């Protein structure tokens, strides 16, 4: 983003607050949120040295809300992609929906693999494999591998820890994510209850 990380943190906090209020909840500011915002803002400004981001933690503690806020923030700045001339955007998909798209809409699947910034919400909730006309497909493994090979920014949210992601998706995927992904822990409790 074309701003420093401190300014990005202020904008991101405002975007999170707006998203929380949009969902008819009360925004709660605190130390844990400040750490999360600072890490994500650092990543958004390209200062982390990693091209992908993992928001990992328990249920209901704000990971998806962060992604919606990032999506609104990136849209607000209207940053142009030098290759396409179009504005960058964050495309957000639920992991279960991605598995379904892979199976039922192959053309859409192919185009979303190349999205500027792809956000995968609830990594770990989707079926690991799907069968299509006798072919066994591993949509998320294939998607993460493709985006790794092409160095495309990917945002992941998950209730799984990085270690659990390695166990579920294999050592190779875990190692690739370790290399390319800034991990932001969400250690706070659920905001839902």
Question: For the regions a protein language model found, what residue spans apply to each?
Answer:
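A short, basic N-terminal segment
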Residues: 1-49, 183-184, 188, 193
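Walker A (P-loop) ATP-phosphate-binding motif of ABC ATPase nucleotide-binding domains
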Residues: 52
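Hydrophobic anchor at the beta1->P-loop junction of P-loop NTPases
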Residues: 55
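Conserved glycine(s) of the Walker
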Residues: 60-63
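Hydrophobic positions on the alpha1 helix immediately C-terminal to the Walker A/P-loop
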Residues: 66, 70
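Post-Walker A helix-loop "phosphate-sensing" segment adjacent to the P-loop in P-loop NTPases
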Residues: 72-90
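Conserved nucleotide-sensing/catalytic segment adjacent to the nucleotide-binding pocket
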Residues: 84-148
